[in-house]
Amino acid sequence: MVYSKQSDDNFVKIDTLPTYYKNAVIAVEDHRFEKHGAIDFIAIGRAIVRNISNFKLLEGGSTITQQVANNLYFIEEDVNPILRKVAEIFVAFDLEKQYSKNEILELYINTIYFGNGYYGVKEACNGYLNKDPKDMTLYDATMLAGIPNAPSVYAPTVNPDLTRSRQEKVIQSMVKYGYLSQEEADKLILNDN
């Protein structure tokens, strides 16, 4: 196993998690995860066009695999960002050779930062929800899946209204990519847990 910020006690096997959590993560973070390799040229192209046309950095094009590469191997923040991105791409290609998509997703959910010092889904579930990851509800899953995009903004302890707004984006992404029906999404949004 590769280096992880998680202790063995906090590492969660992906097959113990509710399927809807995995689906929420894929829908909001990398909806083409199962279809592309280490990098997604379509997402990168879209990000470049959008960023250039708006004259600012609005979105990235990193895949889940690239995020795993970054989480596991690139600790130093003061590295040249272009060199770091190139190295991240090479590491991502290597990860895709060594691990299945399921294993990469497992590494992602165990190393991603959720804010408040919580690394990985187990710490986030325990810290924010006071429950074990296997016990999270669909509502919980959609909230947690939205946090890693910007933990300092979307953590529920920071701004519950922004957390809720981001959660609704996750829910709508799940509808868009076929993981939830619009009826299920509407009930979830109205239910408020």
Each PLM stretch: what is its role?
Residues M1-N193:
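Juxtamembrane regions of bacterial inner-membrane/periplasmic proteins
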